[in-house]
Amino acid sequence: MQNTCTLNKKNSYSYDDLLASGRGELFGKEGPQLPAPTMLMMDRIVEMNEETGTFGKGYIEAELDIKPELPFFGCHFIGDPVMPGCLGLDAMWQLVGFYLGWIGGKGKGRALGVGEVKFTGQILPTAKKVVYRIHMKRVINRKLVMGMADGEVEVDGRVIYTATDLKVGLFQDTSAF
């Protein structure tokens, strides 16, 4: 798949770049978009490429700086604040969709599933940094563009979530989805 947005194809992206993606400015109005804050689950993408990763088909690494004032800590749970695990899973889906746009895919991104997710730790407001790592396994470029990847979430140097077979599709029309 050829990237038609070569001007925007970099190996790392700042927070401002990620916000531009949410406005449809990074990969164009027909490319996938990241969500806006407060659902944007990363502050930067520190590495992206098409050649490495566990399967040699692409790798993405992104980071989220943890601050006690992040909105989810105030409500999940009162007196026992913890980042919802589903937000870490969503961050991995967000990154697979971003990758599809980065390689030139067009359409609106939708999570399609995950093979298996394991949670072996938690993200507390006392943590400093979350690192997301995505290892692309496959990209299908037909009527539906779909990416499949494995991923992990690390907090302060310890892997706490793993996911296999993360699937994201890019749809030209989401009305029947």
Swiss-Prot record:
Q: Name one GO molecular function term.
A: (3R)-hydroxyacyl-[acyl-carrier-protein] dehydratase activity
InterPro entries found in the cross-reference section: FabA, FabA_FabZ, HotDog_dom_sf
- Gene Ontology, cellular component aspect: cytoplasm
Q: Name one Pfam family in it.
A: FabA
Which E.C. number(s) belong to this protein? 4.2.1.59, 5.3.3.14
Q: Which residues form the active site?
A: 76
Give its localization.
Cytoplasm
Q: What's the main place this protein lives? A: cytoplasm
Q: What does this protein do?
A: Necessary for the introduction of cis unsaturation into fatty acids. Catalyzes the dehydration of (3R)-3-hydroxydecanoyl-ACP to E-(2)-decenoyl-ACP and then its isomerization to Z-(3)-decenoyl-ACP. Can catalyze the dehydratase reaction for beta-hydroxyacyl-ACPs with saturated chain lengths up to 16:0, being most active on intermediate chain length.
Record text on subunit structure and interactions: Homodimer.
Q: Which NCBIfam families match?
A: fabA (TIGR01749), PRK05174.1 (NF003509)
**Name used for this protein in its record:** 3-hydroxydecanoyl-[acyl-carrier-protein] dehydratase
Which organism does this sequence originate in?
Haemophilus influenzae (strain 86-028NP)
The organism that produces this protein has a lineage beginning with: Bacteria, Pseudomonadati, Pseudomonadota, Gammaproteobacteria, Pasteurellales
